[in-house]
């Protein structure tokens, strides 16, 4: 019975539809306190970085920045933390650059290093964090605090991931207003979010049923894989991380083309539970349908298709499990990453409950500071 396998990841997923609109409002209030019209008007380059899930939040915000900064002469780029710290070229006086480092805790050494490097090069630095008093929050010129409400069993952090994305989405609209002189962009996005949030909430029980059925069917898999293209690739990386954190399973991430170059030859070929993400009106739909059909017909895999339409309507010719995911209209498709990770996270949560594995292997070595040096690694400001 599904109710016997309720789990912390599932409870976080179900709370997200309550959290999302509230988190938007909290982010907006926090950002306006930083006086963006005065502090951000000169910005022409926005660099957003972070470690782990925080980088993925940055990657998932690319499209919303692209939408709201179009025609302003300002551009956004999302880069991984080690690149921002050690490899990314910065001018000696990059005063027109806003460097944003994301960390919910604000504690990682690499985040502090990035902020110090940004200051050395004349950037305006911002910490997007849930802890303004942290090392990141006190190192940055600006502490953009998410103020995410407390929640029981909040690890691993789906809520902090949503909060980081929401903070960036709000920043994109406000910066768009500042740079373009337009008004109402933030209000427009808030209204679209509210509408999409309602559609997603109405479908959540059905997605939960689909996720439980898929987890049961895939329970004995040797490993897992997420196949997704375009912006949803980062969603796949997030789901992969959840499997590692909650059940300790390896979960690879691949796009529909590279699957046939590499991952299709992983052995045993039928041993990997697979979650495929598809959107019916996007240009890669046909290729995704071909890949999904091949995963089942040629490799014998158990496959869950997460899409906005039944698999047969996408062109899938093989029998698969299905999870219907509402998607926003094309002009606001950039909202999809705020929720797309939920079906895969539900499957990971149920899988972990079914095999009775403690999250993070019960602690132990994962939290040993002599092994996990995220907060103590040497800082080198280049």
Identify the residue ranges that each predicted region occupies:
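Conserved phosphate/anionic-ligand binding catalytic regions in large, soluble enzymes, centered on
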Residues: 6-9, 48, 54-61, 236-245, ...
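Active-site phosphate/pyrophosphate-binding segments
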Residues: 11-44, 144, 150-159, 164-273, ...
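Short conserved micro-motifs at the rims of enzyme active sites and ligand-binding pockets
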Residues: 238, 287-289, 316, 336, ...
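Charge-biased C-terminal accessory regions appended to nucleic-acid-, cytoskeletal NTPase
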Residues: 300-304, 323-382
